[in-house]
Amino acid sequence: MFAMKRREFIAASAAVAASSLLPQTPAWARGRKVRLAMIGTGMRGLVLLKELVRRDDVEVVALCDIEPIMLGRAMDMVAKAGKPAPKTYGQDRDTHAWKRLLEQKGIDGVIIATPWEYHAPMAIAAMQAGVAVGCEVVAGITLQDHWDVLKTQLSTGTPYMLLENVCYRRDVMAALQMVRQGLFGELVHLQAGYQHDLRGVKFNSGDPNQPYDSGVEFGPKGWSEARWRTEHSVERNGELYPSHGIGPCAMYTGINRGNRFTHINAFATKARGLHEYTVAKSGGTTHPSTKVKFKLGDIVTTTLACENGETILLQHDTSLPRPYSMGFRVQGTKGLWMDVNHSIHIEGRSPPHQWEEFKKYQDEYEHPLWKQNADTAASAGHGGMDWFVIHAFVEALKAKAPMPIDIYDAVTWSAITPLSEQSIANSFQTLEFPDFTAGAWKQRKPIFAFDGKY
């Protein structure tokens, strides 16, 4: 059924399992510097670059972007941090410049922060070159992309980490502590999603100094994400951005480590929000953007069934007016947490049939990573999450240890997108979820955020 044969995975998985015996933070690694490159210095890339240049154990040796303005901003950031100037690629707008970057000698790892469609080919090429990959979320576009990325990682042994920052969100990590200590009892049902009004991100004026909420252009006339992300709303209908929600839920339920997804289906509403936005923002129906037919349903609801009996519901909601929320709900036999109302209820501890404020529980169950690093992470992007995810990648790379969000996590979470598209296109069909681990999920043990190091 799939391009990579089961026996190939079994053989390769054995090697990966052996690598899990490596020590997490050997003493020799503590003072080691890593030489990192970055492909993609757009708005997201600059946020991650900020975290790299503030570290004494990282040397940024190469940067690549085909937009000279953004490459220039990246170079300015490195200079202001007092770090040596890295070699640059792409200022001539050569779309293959990233390949030359990967030929540069002495690169330990690369951060990939480009448009989604480039993630898989860039990660594959980097791993084939022996360069460790820290990939921004979305591991691939098609299901075959995910098998190809996985096959390359297993055959080369080159480290790969999906840079899913929400796994490190403060309340999310406190909830992880609660799950592991049995506060919710046995988990039964979880919910999450990417619920974020992106209308002002998918469209802008095309002005590099006004990337958000500034117009209705997209594609070649847009800037930043409006230049590429909006096209996915035109051409695709599915759960386009699953990992922010599914990442924490997968950690809670032990996906790929004692548990797995078995089935998936998805439903999509009609598409109205982006059209109405362009009409209202442009003041009529004459602008070309108002005539575009968007394929992406305004709300996409995806349901996953797990081997151990849990269900997980995801919602993708980016085309309608709304406040930001991930919509987390973690529910078990003893109670539940819901992040929308910042509330929790634990049977035998909470007043009957009443919510309690989550904050006091969060303080009680604060994860050791946040206890140790809250002050350091305070100035980082996304409430500190970006510091933690970069810290994890760098520390694991220095220690030659398994990545805390590994290749199996990456392809499993990201494959929800093409599978949801397939389900919707086939009258909301329920599909079997592929086992990317080839059965290794039965023996693999959880490693994420256990030792207080990363």
Swiss-Prot record:
Membership in a protein family: Belongs to the Gfo/Idh/MocA family. Glycosyl hydrolase 109 subfamily.
Binding note for cofactor: Binds 1 NAD(+) per subunit. The NAD(+) cannot dissociate.
Gene source species: Stenotrophomonas maltophilia (strain K279a)
Ranges in coiled-coil conformation: none
Lineage: Bacteria, Pseudomonadati, Pseudomonadota, Gammaproteobacteria, Lysobacterales
EC number: 3.2.1.-
Function: Glycosidase.
Keywords: Glycosidase, Hydrolase, NAD, Signal
Cofactor: NAD(+)
Name of protein: Glycosyl hydrolase family 109 protein
Xref: InterPro entries: Gfo/Idh/MocA-like_OxRdtase_N, Gfo/Idh/MocA_oxidrdct_glycsds, Glyco_hydro_109_C, NAD(P)-bd_dom_sf, TAT_signal
Pfam families noted in UniProt: GFO_IDH_MocA, Glyco_hydro_109_C
PANTHER family xrefs: BCDNA.GH03377 (PTHR43818), GLYCOSYL HYDROLASE FAMILY 109 PROTEIN (PTHR43818:SF1)
Gene3D superfamilies in the cross-refs: Dihydrodipicolinate Reductase, domain 2, NAD(P)-binding Rossmann-like Domain
Database matches in SUPFAM superfamilies: Glyceraldehyde-3-phosphate dehydrogenase-like, C-terminal domain, NAD(P)-binding Rossmann-fold domains
